[in-house]
Amino acid sequence: MTSEGSNTTGTSARPPGRGAGSGSRPVPASTPAPDGRPEILALRALKLGDLLVAVPALKGLRRAYPEHRILYAAQEWLRPMMPLTDAVDDLLPTHGLDDPLPIEHGRIDLAVNLHGSGGESRGRLEEIGARRRMGHRSPGWDGPEWRSGILERERWASLVSWHGVPADPLDCRLRVPDVENPAPDAVVVHVGAAYGSRLWPVDRFAAVARTLAAAGHRVVFTGSARERPRALAVADAAGLPAATVAAGDLPLDAFAGLVAGASLVISADTGAAHLASAYARPSVVLFGPAPPSEWGPPPGPHTVLTDESVRVGETFSATPDPALLAVTVDQVLAAAAGHGIS
């Protein structure tokens, strides 16, 4: 859950540039066809948690521009989340910033940089020839200065607010997907993470799950398909059957539905934790390299566990951050008990 971060990005007119539709390359068939409405393109080509902290800003844009079609530029696998935001109309499949955005030059009315404030994201948006732009202050862009050390929800809500689009950073709720919940009222133990720096040890997850299962709670282990072997290892160490492992088995909307109906979510600082926030489900969130002051949950039934005094903060490290390793099994069980799960 990272972006380019900080150099200085806004709503400003600009000279035409060359985008995917101006001769630089053909627009792929996966690009949504125009439907006659003016369009907003919000760029945030990152992961699930990054989308969820941008929801308040997206909802602000939806309210401010009810006649516009809002396209969200991000990876294709996030598509099932778009209708759940009640803000985004369609996804523009975008895998990072290495290639030009797959949209016709001059088609977009308003380009919004929710990706970061660096030269890469600005350059990709400048190429598409939008009539207006929103972003942080930087060369050629009007907008607020980039601020370090603030909550991401606040960052993006305050960005669009600066540009005249009121947004509430606590307006982060999602609609519950219209899918069957495979395990209502389960304790969801999300064992995966994008980077090793956020991987709490298998034996500790197993100890927590073993205790909660012995107390009569239904435990379900989640993660991506790539993380299924890790989830199976946790289940095995906890003495629980492979049937408790849903990692790799759930489409994204079904995963959202599982979290929306959970009795408790236990997770590192990942998309699963942000889903628990979006559905106001009780959660215990284990923080490693990312500070809770920037990525922590909103007010609600959420407990943050970490030791900031030993944080290294290397997100892309292959080894768990000391701030995460400082969290003990007993701390997690005590936090779960605080939410009525013991």
Where are the predicted features?
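Catalytic machinery of carbohydrate-active enzymes
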Residues: 1-342
